[in-house]
């Protein structure tokens, strides 16, 4: 909904203060990784991943990370990746997920409640003449992460 009825309200703030666009090869309802652009004054970002996967899929993603930790670390700890995406996920478990050891050295990668990444950008990023090229560069850095997650989802289905 673009507008809300503010005729009789003291609070005249708009219903929605941002514009977002999401692209996913498997469709917007898919659990596969997609690419998201969020435009909002003072809160712009480029993001992607598998947001709020259902519990069985989340278990499969955690198992894939556990079983392929060297490959996963080579993706998410790559300096070129980390310069844009310093953190994996937004919400985390406080302890080890069920079925995984509490003393696992890379537990932080298993504690994710979703496998997403986000790159916050200043508003000026989207006003620059080369913002499409720079956006493309950022999403190219995210591709290996997306591929890892998508391969796991493909195997799960």
Locations of regions flagged by a protein language model:
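Compact, glycine/acidic-enriched structural inserts
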Residues: 39-99
């Amino acid at each position: 909904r673009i507008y809300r009825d503010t005729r009789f309200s003291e609070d005249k703030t708009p219903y929605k203060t941002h514009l977002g666009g999401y692209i996913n090869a498997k469709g917007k309802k898919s659990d596969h990784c997609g690419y998201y652009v969020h435009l909002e004054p003072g809160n712009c970002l480029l993001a992607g991943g598998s947001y709020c996967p259902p519990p069985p899929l989340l278990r499969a993603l955690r198992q894939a990370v556990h079983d392929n930790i060297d490959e996963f670390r080579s993706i998410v700890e790559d300096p070129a990746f980390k310069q844009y995406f310093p953190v994996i996920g937004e919400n985390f478990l406080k302890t080890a997920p069920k079925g995984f050891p509490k003393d696992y050295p890379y537990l932080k990668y298993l504690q994710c409640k979703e496998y997403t990444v986000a790159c916050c950008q200043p508003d000026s990023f989207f006003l620059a003449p080369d913002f499409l090229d720079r956006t493309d560069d950022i999403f190219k850095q995210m591709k290996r992460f997306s591929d890892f997650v998508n391969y796991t989802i493909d195997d799960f289905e």
